[in-house]
Amino acid sequence: MLVLGLETSCDETGVALYDSERGLLADALFSQIDLHRAYGGVVPELASRDHVKRMLPLIRQTLAEADCVATDIDAIAYTAGPGLVGALLVGASCAQALAFAWDIPALGVHHMEGHLLAPMLEENPPQFPFVALLVSGGHTQLVRVDGIGQYELLGETLDDAAGEAFDKTAKMMGMQYPGGPEISKAAMQGVAGRFVFPRPMTDRPGLEFSFSGLKTSALNTWQQCQGAGDDSEQTRCDIALAFQQAVVETLTIKCKRALKQTGLKSLVIAGGVSANKALRASLESMLGDLRGNVYYARPEFCTDNGAMIAFAGCQRLQAGQKEDLSISVQARWLMEQLPGL
């Protein structure tokens, strides 16, 4: 089965072709980072308009790269949520229109299920069951995964997601959007031990997260330094390092706790923050001590992309899941509501 995948949940337009027998044939991505940087964050209306502009050229590019034509495609998978409604509608309407014109099925895919399954595109994919850490700008969740659509939420953030905390902390220190990579870059030049921030909710049982207070601690420290006349680049780097260390250690502690609670030895990390090298190193060390394994996607598939949507859609389509050609998207959508395969 050859599936065309379309991703338009936020500020990346992603298109890919995945074949159930040959694997990933082609993928293309256009990032809107430069478009939104001047505003310090994503402007939904601008995002939607740019998706309209980029979608069809990217589809043509992907078909050409895979040496395929429209009649080769068996089905279309598109992101139906969660995400920005206007952006989602661009991908959904395009998918349904093409499906109608080509007389093939179209299936809406859960954005975070796409992220969760992205490591399965790698040469050494994880095997069920496993614990997944979904960590992005909008989500921080620990999930037990027993199969596709068989998800048990173990814990999630009570306020800011980890990626959101990275972005907001970077913004308040005058760094460019997107803030996560800027924090990581600055942290490489930081001096360890100058600042120490709390590891929120690690001193109590449970698998919930909270990053709002950590973000506030970083803000207060930065403002105190500014008040003392020290707003140097080195101070910014030192705060970035302390902040990143706090987030990484918090996530690692909670992941270790989840693995022990479930008795599992395999951990998948997915979502934009899973590309963070410090987080990967910390989790690899922790899993090494537990004699377990950690899995993640290649860096370009950690952020939003069409390949993960094509793959996730292919799994569900092959299992017989079907939808009509009505256009329906969801800004909020619990992954536990998905049907199991």
Curated annotation (Swiss-Prot):
GO molecular function: iron ion binding; N(6)-L-threonylcarbamoyladenine synthase activity
HAMAP family (alphabetical): TsaD
Binding site for Fe cation: H111, H115, D304
Biological role: Required for the formation of a threonylcarbamoyl group on adenosine at position 37 (t(6)A37) in tRNAs that read codons beginning with adenine. Is involved in the transfer of the threonylcarbamoyl moiety of threonylcarbamoyl-AMP (TC-AMP) to the N6 group of A37, together with TsaE and TsaB. TsaD likely plays a direct catalytic role in this reaction.
Cofactor note: Binds 1 Fe(2+) ion per subunit.
Primary location recorded for the protein, binned into one broad class: cytoplasm
Cellular component GO terms, alphabetical: cytoplasm
Catalytic activity: L-threonylcarbamoyladenylate + adenosine(37) in tRNA = N(6)-L-threonylcarbamoyladenosine(37) in tRNA + AMP + H(+)
Transmembrane annotation, as ranges: none
Family affiliation: Belongs to the KAE1 / TsaD family.
Protein name per its UniProtKB record: tRNA N6-adenosine threonylcarbamoyltransferase
Cofactor requirements of the protein: Fe(2+)
Location in the cell: Cytoplasm
List of residues binding substrate: L134, V135, S136, G137, G138, D167, G180, N276
InterPro entries: ATPase_NBD, Gcp-like_dom, KAE1/TsaD, TsaD
NCBIfam families the record matches: gcp_kae1 (TIGR00329), T6A_TsaD_YgjD (TIGR03723)
Keyword line: Acyltransferase, Cytoplasm, Iron, Metal-binding, Transferase, tRNA processing
